[in-house]
């Protein structure tokens, strides 16, 4: 890979580490590219944010390839998710402490599978209040952390499939394919509400964005060994 090719425009696949924001990952990529190729400036962007607590695929575009970002953002995504039932958190993930513990001794595997099927197709969900969505010019998570009352608007999204279901109470794991803009944290929360015992997202890994797979990230030019070796 040459400096000219990167400036002209390339698409790279990166496996984002846990507890990194997508913004931090992009900054790291810029730093590494500038250091490696002596760039003074380089345009770098990604096609779809991942929460800090999530790992997995970031599609990174450089140079003129950044024009492809909006097109890539529109394609379906796939995630591996783990949820914990019988308890909730304010953030719908592990960022906030557990609240509202509920007995789950009456919950069966068949009931969980039945509930998961209800979320196939077009659904309506509310994004978590701890999200990057802007409300009157401010990020929802900034308002929530400041103690402000935050009302999130419902949005429609599509769940294409939920498969490879593994149940080891209180944990439920599955692969989910979904449309652009789906919040898996909200899906976890809503599954818990439908079960009647609450739930939150304990692990999330993005495995695919359209035709791109996280399995390809380890062998492409911007490998994690190259990018994150100096963390």
Where is each model-derived feature located?
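Catalytic/RNA-binding core of pseudouridine synthases
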Residues: 1-231
């Amino acid at each position: 890979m040459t400096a000219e090719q990167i400036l002209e425009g390339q698409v790279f696949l990166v496996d984002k580490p846990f507890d990194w924001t997508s913004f931090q990952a992009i900054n790291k990529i810029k730093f590494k590219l500038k250091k490696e190729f002596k760039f003074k400036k380089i345009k770098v962007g990604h096609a779809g944010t991942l929460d800090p607590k999530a790992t997995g695929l970031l599609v990174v575009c450089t140079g003129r390839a950044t024009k492809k970002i909006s097109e890539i953002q529109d394609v379906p995504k796939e995630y591996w998710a783990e949820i914990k039932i019988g308890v909730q958190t304010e953030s719908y993930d592990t960022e906030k402490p557990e609240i509202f513990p509920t007995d789950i001794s009456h919950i069966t595997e068949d009931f969980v599978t039945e509930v998961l099927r209800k979320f196939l197709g077009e659904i309506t969900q509310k994004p978590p209040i701890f999200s990057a969505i802007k409300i009157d010019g401010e990020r929802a998570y900034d308002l929530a952390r400041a103690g402000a009352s935050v009302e999130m608007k419902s949005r429609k999204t599509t769940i294409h499939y939920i498969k490879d279901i593994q149940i080891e109470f209180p944990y439920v794991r599955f692969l989910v394919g979904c449309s652009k803009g789906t919040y898996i944290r909200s899906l976890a929360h809503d599954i818990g509400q439908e079960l009647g015992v609450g739930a939150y997202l304990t692990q999330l890994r993005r495995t695919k964005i359209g035709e791109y797979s996280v399995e390809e990230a380890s062998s492409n030019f911007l490998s994690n060994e190259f990018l994150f070796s100096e963390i």
